[in-house]
Amino acid sequence: SPWEILAQPFEPDISKQRLEVLFDPLRQRLPALLARVPATDGAAAELPESLQEQLSIDLLESWGYDNQRCQRSRSAHPFSCTLGPQDYRITTRVVAGQPFSCFLATAHEWGHSLYEQGLPHDQPHAFPWPLGDATSMGVHESQSLFWECRVARSEAFARRWHSGFCL
């Protein structure tokens, strides 16, 4: 399939058929689940850009951000990259009217960096060889989505950070 051709460089051991077995049951149940999600009240819709940026910095610091090894910047589209075993960089963005966008993008991109920092870079000859490289793009993305969706969107996390989003 066209999907498999495009996915092979990133996920060589996965097939469209294998993914359909995994996702078809979810596809059937997802509409009912989404219908149960309450609408937001927009309480934080006008959070100033400077506060959004500060909250993202506070988040990084609470998760062990080290400005000697890490760099955070602002860009049009969030991304992360590792330039060496002690050089992790992420960018985030601020979107007017979407106060959680910067915070969640920061959580996601920092998740990529945390995964990279957990690779065995301290082993001889690990970087930039396969031993010191991510298993796959899917595993890499799963780790960043874990921090964004399972941690930063959790009820306990919301309780901890709620006051920062209220003016």
Language model region names:
Residues 151-167:
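Long, amphipathic alpha-helical stalk/connector segments used for oligomerization, subunit docking
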Residues 88-92, 123-128:
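Glycine/charged-rich beta-loop-alpha catalytic/anionic-binding loops adjacent to active sites
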Residues 130-141:
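Active-site metal-coordination segments of metallo-dependent hydrolases
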Residues 94, 99-124, 141-145:
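Active-site recognition of the HExxH zinc-binding catalytic motif
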Residues 75-78, 134, 161-166:
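A glycine-rich phosphate-binding loop feature that marks nucleotide/adenosyl-phosphate handling sites
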Residues 1-100:
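Contiguous, non-catalytic segments that form substrate-binding/exosite surfaces or channel walls
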Residues 110, 129-130:
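NAD(P)-dependent dehydrogenase/reductase Rossmann-like domain
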Residues 29, 33-36, 58-62, 106-113, ...:
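Generic, well-ordered alpha-helical scaffold segments in large soluble proteins
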